[in-house]
UniProtKB/Swiss-Prot annotation:
Keywords: Nitrogen fixation. The keyword Membrane does not apply. InterPro entries: CowN. The gene is cowN. This is N(2)-fixation sustaining protein CowN. Coiled coil: none annotated. Belongs to the CowN family. Is required to sustain N(2)-dependent growth in the presence of low levels of carbon monoxide (CO). Probably acts by protecting the N(2) fixation ability of the nitrogenase complex, which is inactivated in the presence of CO. It comes from the Bacteria. It comes from Azospirillum sp. (strain B510).
């Protein structure tokens, strides 16, 4: 895909699967924060916020909003655990959806 064919969120979100991209990152994030050796108080609280985000009647922010608001913390977690695939997905999400 050349630069003219690449999705551009500033023009339109058409063709950008922000919901799917955020879901994949949330799944990837759980791979780390569900491991007791990798989690801490911040990630425990974040996991609780993700659970609330799944419930449209309770949520104040959806999963995409939580990811975008915490992108640097998530990047640090992925870097700390050498998760290059997670970082690539996160960069794509930030470029296309945040």
């Amino acid at each position: 895909m050349d630069s003219f064919d690449a999705p551009d969120r500033y023009v339109s979100f058409k063709g950008i699967d922000c919901e799917g991209n955020s879901r994949r990152i949330i799944d990837r994030l759980h791979m780390h924060i569900d491991d007791p050796a990798k989690t801490n108080a911040f990630w425990e609280r974040f996991r609780a916020k993700l659970a609330i985000a799944e419930d449209p009647l309770k949520r104040q922010a959806d999963g995409l909003c939580l990811l975008c608001a915490n992108i640097y913390y998530i990047a640090d977690l992925f870097e700390e655990h050498d998760d290059e695939d997670g970082l690539a997905m996160l960069r794509q999400l930030e470029d296309e959806c945040c």
